[in-house]
Each structure stands twice: as structure tokens, then as C-alpha cells.
Amino acid sequence: MKINPTTSGSGVSTLEKKNMGRIVQIIGPVLDVAFPAGKMPNIYNALVVKGRDTVGQPINVTCEVQQLLGNNRVRAVAMSSTDGLTRGMEVIDTGAPLSVPVGGATLGRIFNVLGEPVDNLGAVDTRTTSPIHRSAPAFIQLDTKLSIFETGIKVVDLLAPYRRGGKIGLFGGAGVGKTVLIMELINNIAKAHGGVSVFGGVGERTREGNDLYMEMKESGVINKENIAESKVALVYGQMNEPPGARMRVGLTALTMAEYFRDVNEQDVLLFIDNIFRFVQAGSEVSALLGRMPSAVGYQPTLSTEMGSLQERITSTKEGSITSIQAVYVPADDLTDPAPATTFAHLDATTVLSRGLAAKGIYPAVDPLDSTSTMLQPRIVGEEHYETAQRVKQTLQRYKELQDIIAILGLDELSEEDRLTVARARKIERFLSQPFFVAEVFTGSPGKYVGLAETIRGFQLILSGELDSLPEQAFYLVGNIDEATAKAMNLEMENNLKK
């Protein structure tokens, strides 16, 4: 059911008329609050604690009701630090779930989980707000069209293409390039598609959040002169926040994206970095609420929590939300319950490989582990499908031969296998690409490669037309013409050395 956003906003002035309770217990970020008989707040209602701490500093903490304990008590999780709270403090029931600002006023701004601006650029128009908890669109409202979303990144567009209005997961351990890939996608999509994006920073590094903001201002995604012309809204609940904020910040970002889809009827991009931190925060809250842990210590409600978020990220007849989610894989174990639960919801998976990153091949996307439901001849066409399959077959054969090469050496292979290995090594290097957002680190200008150019390049390598070129000519270039030009430059350099 579609819920129309409220235009009232839960202002402080209206709080005084609500139910009043008192704190009876504080355990870290969890509060137990006693209310008068018959005046219990509902589950997910926002509670506000206002007062002064022992030093006289004002306190304003918002909590969310999670459990009704009996004996007129509720258990709530705080969305900010509980420092300075004491037993007996007054708690106000707002009578509604957390609501956040939505619409054009959010563009170019940074918000916290409560929808409060944290970028020191003044207040935001809060006349139009929307509750962060709502049901997913009904089946009859969903759109089922299938079309490809071009990213300009060769390995993605060829081997695991993204669906417009789909859900994409970037899987990888620590330090293999998930955040850089997300930043490149934001950059390419803002330039090539001109769409509106919402970025949800869930439990990641504050430094990365700041870097992303500065990067967006430099690239023009956020318009410094006229903020309203910006193309992105940012919502952060970073590593230093309590688990309640990290658990709900994804819903805040999603609520803003839903408004652009349902009311403005736009195609929206929702970036979540990192969806694992959403699960991790849920696990922390679950333990604090006293629930019995499930497999590997995760919360027993893992699938339900993930489903309630993911099912709202969808395309309706009004507009679409294409979601790109970074998924941290603990200890590089894809069978861990958190990444395994996420897999079930995705249309495409981009798996980042530590082995490729160690070889210096960036983006370190594993061409054999990455998958997409879109890679079918009826969707992408015969030419694209055939090229992708032949690339995968060549790389798979190279993988099978690696043990033999390690033991016996290249010379022991048949002529055909040696040719396969040579082409596979060229393909592996041609799958690398210089990024716009990494220019400052590498000094190489970024490249956007169209799908047609990508297919043409790999067809030329597979056909054997470029067998004479050295493999380093294919490393960190854009299209195939740049590779041939680089080969000529390398040849000239070698001749000069002689």
C-alpha cells in the first residue's frame, strides 16, 4: 500500500501534548521506559528524551520502541549516544514512527538517521516528511520490464550487466575496492544518465563519507553554487554511531529514494555502503534486546529484517529504484549468513577478488564468480551473450591450466592451450580500466567505455587479430583502440632502448 507522506512533521511544539513516561533502566543504547496504564506507545513509535545532564547541558535523544515488556514498560533503542541520561528522566511518546524530510529539499545535503542536516548549511524544509517504516509496494504496482543499465565499466557491462530497476551487490573482503567502485558508478551514472541518486552510508568510515562528499562537490554531482541543482542526497550513519542509528539509516535513505520514485515519478539510484553493517547493527540490537542468537551469532530475524528493506527497493509503474549495495564479506567467506542472505535478493552480483587485486588488476572484479540474471540472449542479444560466454570459457580454461603451468611450465602445453593462455592473459588485463575517481591516486585519466566498444574489443582479442600485441598493452586502458596505440608506444620505446 502506498502511504502518502505527511506534511505535518513531528515538531517539538507538538510533543508536549503526547504520552509521558519515565526511564527505569539504561543498558548502553537500550532504554526501558515505564508509561501510565493504558497509554503504551506502539512498536516503532519514536520516543524523545529531553532534559539536562549533570553538568546542565541540554539532552535530546530520540529512541525507537522495539519491545513491549509487560507491566506498562517498553524497551527502546536509542538513535544517538545515551551519555548523560539518568533513571527517572521524562520520555515523550511522539505517537508516530520516525519521519524524515523528503523531496527536492534533500538534494545536495547530508542527513543523519533522524533526517537532521549535519553539513552546517542551515535548516532543511521539513514541510514534507515521510515515515521510515512502510510496507513494500503491492504486486499489482510492480513493473516487470527488463532493460540493461550501462555503467561504462567493461567487466560489469560485458559479464554481469546490471538491470535497470534491479538490485546489485558488490561482494568483497576488506580493501579490495568496493567503495571505489561505488564512487565510480555514482560518477558515471550522474554524468551519463543525469539521474537522481541517494547514498546511504551505513556503518562505514567517516573519512570515506567525507571523501565522497568532497569528490561529489568537485565533480559537480553536488552543485556548490546552487544546492537545489544537485543530483544526490546523502544519509550517513557511520561506524561511530550507536547500533540503533546504523540499523535504521538504510531505511532513512530508502524513504528519500521512494519519494523520488512514487511522487516525482523519477528513476532513482540508491547506493548502500555497506549492507553488511545493516545486518551487523541488527545483530547488536538483537543481542541487547535479549533475543537468542542464531547461526554464527547473527540475529534470528536476519531474513525478515533483510527482506523488509530489500522488498521496498523495487520498480513500480511510477518510477524505478536501481540499487547498488556494497556487501562486506567477513573473512572472504561467501557462505557467511549475512552475504548469503543478501544473495537471495539480488539480480546481479559483482564479486571482487583479492587475487586480482594482488595482481594489480583494478577493478578487481572476478569474471567467473560474478553473475547476472540479465545475461541471456533474449535480453542482451546473441552477439553480447556469445562474446561473454567465450570470454568466460577462455578464462575458465586458463584457470584449469594454471596448476599444470605451475608444475611443468608453459612449454609443456599444446599449441592450442598456449594460444588460449596468451589470449586469456590479454583478456584478464583488458578487463582492467582506469577510473575517474582514482585519477588522483594513479595519475591516469579515467575512461568510460560504451557497451558496443566493449563487445568489439573482446571480439578482436578472441578472434586472434591482436595475438601479436604484448599483453601489457591491454593493461589499464579504455577501449581496444587505446590498447593498440599503447602497443605501438611500447614498441617504439623498446626500439629506442636498443
From Swiss-Prot:
Belongs to the ATPase alpha/beta chains family. HAMAP family: ATP_synth_beta_bact. This is ATP synthase subunit beta, chloroplastic. F-type ATPases have 2 components, CF(1) - the catalytic core - and CF(0) - the membrane proton channel. CF(1) has five subunits: alpha(3), beta(3), gamma(1), delta(1), epsilon(1). CF(0) has four main subunits: a(1), b(1), b'(1) and c(9-12). It is found in: Plastid, Chloroplast thylakoid membrane. Produces ATP from ADP in the presence of a proton gradient across the membrane. The catalytic sites are hosted primarily by the beta subunits. It catalyses: ATP + H2O + 4 H(+)(in) = ADP + phosphate + 5 H(+)(out). Its main location: plastid. It comes from Coffea arabica (Arabian coffee). Signal peptide: none annotated. GO terms for cellular component: chloroplast thylakoid membrane; mitochondrion; proton-transporting ATP synthase complex. PANTHER family: ATP SYNTHASE (PTHR15184), ATP SYNTHASE SUBUNIT BETA, MITOCHONDRIAL (PTHR15184:SF71).
